[in-house]
């Protein structure tokens, strides 16, 4: 899935979590 608080790369790929909302 794709979080608006994360930079989508791949479903099984690396993701960069951006903590903005709980």
UniProtKB/Swiss-Prot annotation:
Top-rank taxon, per record: Eukaryota
Annotated localization: Secreted
Function: Antibacterial peptide active against Gram-positive bacterium M.luteus and Gram-negative bacterium E.coli.
UniProt KW keywords: Antibiotic, Antimicrobial, Immunity, Innate immunity, Secreted
Induction or repression: By bacterial infection.
GO annotation, cellular component aspect: extracellular region
Disordered, as annotated region: 1-22
An individual GO BP term: innate immune response
Protein name per the record: Proline-rich peptide
């Amino acid at each position: 899935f794709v979080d608006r608080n994360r930079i989508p790369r791949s479903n099984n790929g690396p993701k960069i979590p951006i903590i903005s909302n709980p």
